[in-house]
């Protein structure tokens, strides 16, 4: 029977990281604290259907209702007033986080056309990983017929790693398909 990503983490990844980085305390072991999904919706200020469609897609992808991000101040150049919706975001933790990451690694990323792995250069230098998805159609929950327009989203994986090497080791041990270029 296949193990879940959380079981793999506790049974395989933790002992491997303790050996690799010579940790003396179990609490020093790296872990993922949260995964944040974000989508900017500048055009949602003119068309409310775009906001509703994006909320529905995020609920399908993540399993929870997204937070609507509103403009903090008015910007005449972008035709945005204070309080208008400019994006949506979801923060996943615990069980939903592991479920989403497992689905992303094993189902969604391989569905990208000409996929050769994700870039190692997307780490922020402190062990956190950022990934931009160009189209929401790679997720199995999104049906092609239900999509009115192809929109992307940003995925941020926040870890307890202090360095980029630790972050790479953690995500690689969890099965993230990095390209080695």
Curated annotation (Swiss-Prot):
Record keyword Transcription regulation present: no
Keywords tagged on the record: Chloroplast, Plastid, Ribonucleoprotein, Ribosomal protein, RNA-binding, rRNA-binding
Disulfide bond positions: none
Top-rank taxon: Eukaryota
Biological process, per Gene Ontology: translation
Any one GO molecular function term: rRNA binding
Predominant location: plastid
GO CC terms in record: chloroplast; ribonucleoprotein complex; ribosome
Localisation per UniProt entry: Plastid, Chloroplast
Family the entry assigns: Belongs to the universal ribosomal protein uL5 family.
Assembly, per entry: Part of the 50S ribosomal subunit; contacts the 5S rRNA.
Its job: Binds 5S rRNA, forms part of the central protuberance of the 50S subunit.
HAMAP family: Ribosomal_uL5_B
Protein name: Large ribosomal subunit protein uL5c
Lineage, broadest ranks: Eukaryota, Cryptophyceae, Pyrenomonadales, Geminigeraceae, Guillardia
